[in-house]
């Protein structure tokens, strides 16, 4: 369920990600709207999470994580329920955060995504297999 609260709306779930940020309400709304538009969820703000598709729920969860502005992000199969085009957009958004001095630890079986990473570690072999 991506850690979302099913009986809340998308908007209410995203507000959780902003709850402890020390910025104005206006700034919070601006940040939230930017991600909502970027991730193609503009028409879903008032929908209850349980009515969303798996891919939509996954995008809401990723937005909520990004709204918390973490230094280290752990993304386990972040594109698993997404179509290829949306998945690539999400990956580019996550990599954009890395460019802002964030750390992204990404677990994936998709080698096309893995090959875009700075380092690849094989968890079965317990070793680094590539460094870009």
Briefly describe each language-model feature range.
Residues 73-76:
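Catalytic Walker B motif of ABC-type/P-loop ATPase nucleotide-binding domains
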Residues 8-16:
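Short coil-to-helix segment of the ABC ATPase nucleotide-binding domain corresponding to the Q-loop/switch region
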């Amino acid at each position: 369920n991506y850690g979302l609260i099913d009986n809340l709306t998308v908007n209410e779930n995203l507000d959780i990600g902003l709850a402890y940020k020390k910025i104005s309400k206006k700034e919070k709304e601006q940040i939230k709207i930017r991600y909502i538009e970027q991730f193609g969820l503009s028409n879903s703000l008032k929908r209850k999470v349980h009515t969303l598709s798996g891919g939509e729920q996954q995008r809401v969860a990723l937005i909520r994580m990004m709204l918390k502005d973490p230094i280290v992000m752990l993304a386990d199969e972040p594109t698993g329920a997404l179509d290829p085009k949306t998945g690539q957009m999400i990956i580019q958004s996550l990599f954009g955060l890395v460019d802002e001095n964030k750390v992204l630890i990404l677990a994936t079986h998709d080698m096309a995504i893995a090959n875009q990473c700075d380092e690849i570690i094989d968890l079965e072999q317990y070793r680094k297999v590539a460094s870009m």
